[in-house]
Amino acid sequence: MSRLSCVLTIALSVTALAACSPAKQAGPNAAPSAGEINLYTARHYDADLQLYAAFTKATGIKVNRLEMQPDQLIERTKAEGEASPADVILMADAGALWRAEAAGLFQPLTTPTLAARIPVALRDPKGQWWGFSRRARVIAYDKAAVKPEEVAHYDQIAGPRFKGKVCVRSSDNVYNLSLMAALIEHWGEAKALNWAKGVVANMARAPQGGDIDQIRAVEAGACQVALTNTYYYLRLAASPDAADKAAAARVGLSFPEQDGVGTHVNISGGGLAAHAPNKAAAIKFLEFLASDEAQAILAGANHEYPAVEGLPSPPDVAAYSKFKSDPMAVSIYGQRQAQAQGVYDQAGWR
């Protein structure tokens, strides 16, 4: 199924945007509908269908979902302008949220519910967007070949120990960009550039694939270490496929910087679209994402960490939840994103 295709799931009361076309003019002259919202999302997780179904069950409001890649979503919404039917925009990375904000896709929103439940570090200072789940960017390693203390810090994978033994995805991946932005903030650009150059020198192959591909490459012996988000590993571990479970069993996860600033943590989040025709319903949806029910779905169905503090997680997620996380405000990832890409380019990380 194309990422630009609509997804119609009648059983879940999730309806598609009409013809997936901006021809559905829901701009300032269109009548709002209290019974639906139009969701533009860069989250591509089947588990999210449970979120939409739960929201519809609780409120009677239908969710019309259109999935796109982050840059496509931004460009499409900009092109639609005031006629955009989008009510809510979701992204899977703080840097992408910041780019959407810079493009004028959000309007400020602060409600008592959101302000009380979403930590300050996980949201835009101006209320343009809010984080609803967290994910840590960790080091996956071959448990048979690598000792945990050899991957206790991000800079270790750039050292001579891992020459020809590192697998990574491309530098323009949003998760890698946000990690680099955080490293620049902590280390300064010069040290971050040296780190990127070291990783490039240590690559076992050209950057390719997604996070699960990196984990599988470690398990297959193509490399000994890789960068991944936690929920991809947990997805493999929870898979009904025996090969996936075996791969997860042979790969360990290191949460770097436990003796320092803590492991890099990113968010998935969203905000109220700038020209939302169904504003009241959209606000209900955003507040629902911060509810105990939605937070439990994000943790249980997609193995993400809740954004709301103090909530329990399923056993598999909880087992990897006891770590020190970097308290950095995630808005910094967007502010330094262009600089991060420039560092990767200088290092030759394609």
Which stretches of residues belong to each language-model region?
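Periplasmic-binding protein-like
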Residues: 164-172, 288-311
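An extracytoplasmic/periplasmic, membrane-proximal ligand-sensing/linker region
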Residues: 190-192, 303-350
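C-terminal motif of bacterial Sec signal peptides marking the signal peptidase cleavage site
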Residues: 16-19
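A structural signal for short loop-to-beta-strand junctions that line the ligand-binding cleft
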Residues: 84-89, 107-139, 155, 165-168
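A bilobed periplasmic-binding-protein/Venus flytrap-type ligand-binding module shared by bacterial periplasmic
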Residues: 138-145, 265-278, 297
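Ligand-binding pocket segment of bilobal, Venus flytrap-like solute-binding proteins
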Residues: 171, 175, 182-256
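Early extracytoplasmic/lumenal segment of secretory-pathway proteins
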Residues: 21-98, 350
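Short beta-strand->loop
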Residues: 40-43, 125-126, 141-143, 149, ...
